[in-house]
């Protein structure tokens, strides 16, 4: 049986969300005898050196990744997340280029975005994950737009041949099960590989409320705001 490896994880360096501290993360991964772990903070590599040193010291394989917001038709009002992982040095270099360009050329209302055109120029050594229900394929599936989901998945499969994966997860969010079954059906039809992920923002369930507080501070909302979107689960 293939060992489970976390490929979607935000640390405290994500700034927008995430409470995970590098030292605690590596300790937990080593404790669970997991061979590797990825850190995919939002559009930054701030914690990368600390992550690399701690992982290597513990005998854990570090995987460098990043969550990016991709503009549809260069329109930041129509953007969706995409997770990219570095396979090698070339992939790491390409991810650093994308992050830098997002901040120097892609900022909108103070937030960094990337263009599909930039992705098309930086595919070497990069693995792409669909971000499940939140990604562009997932949103099409949840909207019961099968043809659009097929078109979008086919685009990513062509851009990242044998390196694009549809994510499957059960995080307790609304729509998870609907997306999972639709994604499996789509993957079978396209012969697209799938990967199980868990959208990690904290290490222990009791940290959920603290994480919600952090998110509220960022969004300028209060915990008891009935209009506040609930993006996370315990």
How would you name each of these model-derived features?
Residues 1-234:
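Phosphodiester-processing cores and adjacent nucleic acid-binding clamps
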């Amino acid at each position: 049986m293939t060992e489970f490896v976390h490929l979607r994880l935000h640390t405290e360096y994500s700034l927008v969300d995430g409470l995970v501290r590098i030292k605690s993360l590596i300790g937990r991964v080593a404790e669970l005898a997991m061979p590797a772990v990825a850190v995919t903070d939002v559009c930054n590599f701030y914690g990368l050196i600390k992550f690399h040193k701690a992982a290597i010291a513990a005998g854990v394989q570090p995987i460098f990744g990043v969550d990016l917001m991709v503009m549809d038709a260069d329109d930041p009002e129509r953007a969706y997340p995409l997770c990219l992982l570095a396979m090698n040095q070339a992939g790491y270099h390409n991810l650093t280029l994308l992050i830098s360009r997002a901040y120097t050329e892609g900022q909108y209302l103070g937030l960094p975005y990337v263009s599909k055109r930039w992705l098309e120029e930086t595919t070497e050594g990069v693995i792409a994950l669909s971000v499940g229900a939140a990604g562009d394929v997932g949103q099409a599936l949840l909207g019961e737009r099968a043809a659009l989901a097929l078109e979008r998945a086919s685009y990513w499969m062509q851009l990242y041949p044998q390196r694009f994966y549809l994510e499957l997860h059960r995080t307790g969010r609304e729509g998870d099960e609907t997306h999972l079954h639709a994604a499996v059906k789509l993957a079978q039809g396209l012969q697209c590989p799938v990967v199980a992920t868990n959208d990690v923002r904290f290490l222990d369930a009791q940290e959920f409320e603290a994480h919600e507080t952090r998110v509220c501070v960022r969004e300028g909302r209060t915990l008891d705001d009935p209009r506040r979107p609930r993006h996370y689960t315990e």
